[in-house]
Amino acid sequence: MYPAHLLVLLAVCVSLLGASTIPPLPLNLVQFTYLIQCANKGSRASYHYADYGCYCGAGGSGTPVDELDRCCKVHDDCYGEAEKMGCYPKLTMYNYYCGTEGPYCNTKTDCQRYVCACDLQAAKCFARSPYNNKNYNIDTSKRCK
C-alpha cells in the first residue's frame, strides 16, 4: 500500500471517530416550531423562545424567571418523563394539525402521543404567557441559580 493511501485511510478513520461524538440534531424541532407558530397565530417568531430565561433553549437550571420560562421548564420535565418511558423526544416525529382552534396532535404510537402532547402543552403555554424582552438572552450564570 502506498503511503498516500495510508494517510487517506487514517484521515477517514479519524473523521469517523470525531463524527461519532457529534450529537444528533433534534429532528422534531421543526414540528415544535410549527406548533408554536400555530398556537400563537404567528404573533411571535419561534426563535424568540430559543434563548429565553433559564430554561428556554438548550439545558436549564435554577428557578424560572417568569411564567414563560416555567413553560419551558415544564416542557423540559415532560421530555425527561418521555425519556424514562424509553422514548427519544428530540428525535420523535409525530403527526399534528393546525386547526382554527389551534394545534392538535394526531399520532399513532405511545411515544409520538406523549412527545406531541409535551410540545402541544408548551406551545399553548407560550401563546398565553407574557413575553418579557428583558428575559431574552440573559446571563444564565448569574440569574439561573
UniProtKB/Swiss-Prot annotation:
EC category name: hydrolase
The protein depicted here goes by the name: Basic phospholipase A2 cPt09
Cofactor(s) needed for function = Ca(2+)
**Disulfide bridge positions per record:** 38-98, 54-144, 56-72, 71-125, 78-118, 87-111, 105-116
| Gene Ontology molecular functions | calcium ion binding; calcium-dependent phospholipase A2 activity; phospholipid binding
- Entry keyword set: Calcium, Disulfide bond, Hydrolase, Lipid degradation, Lipid metabolism, Metal-binding, Secreted, Signal
Principal place of residence: secreted
Its biological function? Answer: PLA2 catalyzes the calcium-dependent hydrolysis of the 2-acyl groups in 3-sn-phosphoglycerides.
Enumerate the SMART domains for this protein. PA2c
Query: Which catalytic reaction applies to this protein?
Result: a 1,2-diacyl-sn-glycero-3-phosphocholine + H2O = a 1-acyl-sn-glycero-3-phosphocholine + a fatty acid + H(+)
Intracellular or extracellular location(s): Secreted
User: Under which EC number(s) is this enzyme classified?
Assistant: 3.1.1.4
- What is the species listed in this Swiss-Prot or TrEMBL entry? Laticauda semifasciata
| This protein's record includes keyword Disulfide bond | yes
